């Protein structure tokens, strides 16, 4: 609930829950001129909430929880997808695929948040991680994390 509340507080839309993953997006169904800023703020607040939870878990002698987040922005298609008998409100597109790949790369870079070069906003201290070429694309993308 805590992580979901943070996403909603920052204007995000929950797309779906997949195991231990929450997929969310900003800018739909209502436009959001500050969608990248709001997604970044949500990711930072989620990081802080998780650090607090992990401190409690450590005190109780339990294992910590580690998460990863990928932030990317770009053109997407948003709407109801599926059939007439079962459909979901969701988002599709290359920008979504890159965000998912960034999230899945967090372990490789020992990072809890990876942001594409297209999604950097003012007010944070970024650390360059790498330049990656995404499957199916020829142009590399620079990726960053936000220092803790």
Where in this protein do the model-derived segments appear?
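Active-site loop/short helix in cyclic nucleotide turnover domains
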Residues: 7, 26-30, 75-83
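Short beta-strand->loop micro-motif that forms the acidic, two-metal-ion catalytic signature
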Residues: 18-32
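A structural signal for short, well-ordered beta-strand segments
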Residues: 22, 67-73, 143
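Short, surface-exposed loop/helix-turn segments at secondary-structure junctions
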Residues: 58-59, 81-93
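Allosteric regulatory "coupling" segments in signal-transduction proteins
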Residues: 36, 87-92, 129-132
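Cytosolic regulatory/linker segments at or just downstream of nucleotide-handling modules
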Residues: 76-78, 99, 105-148
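Alpha-helical scaffold within the catalytic cores of cyclic-nucleotide enzymes
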Residues: 1-12, 28-69, 94-107, 117, ...
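A short pre-motif secondary-structure segment
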Residues: 14-16
């Amino acid at each position: 609930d805590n992580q979901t509340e943070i996403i909603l507080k920052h204007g995000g839309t929950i797309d779906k829950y997949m195991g231990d993953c929450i997929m969310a997006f900003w800018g739909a169904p209502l436009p959001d001129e500050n969608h990248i800023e709001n997604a970044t703020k949500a990711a930072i607040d989620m990081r802080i909430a998780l650090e607090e939870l992990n401190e409690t878990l450590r005190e109780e002698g339990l294992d910590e929880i580690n998460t990863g987040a990928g932030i990317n922005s770009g053109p997407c298609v948003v709407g109801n997808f599926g059939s007439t008998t079962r459909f979901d409100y969701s988002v599709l597109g290359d920008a979504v695929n890159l965000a998912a790949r960034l999230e899945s790369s967090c372990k490789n870079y020992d990072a809890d948040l990876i942001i594409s070069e297209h999604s950097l906003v003012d007010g944070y201290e970024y650390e360059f991680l790498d330049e990656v070429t995404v499957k199916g694309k020829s142009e590399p993308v620079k990726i960053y994390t936000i220092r803790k």
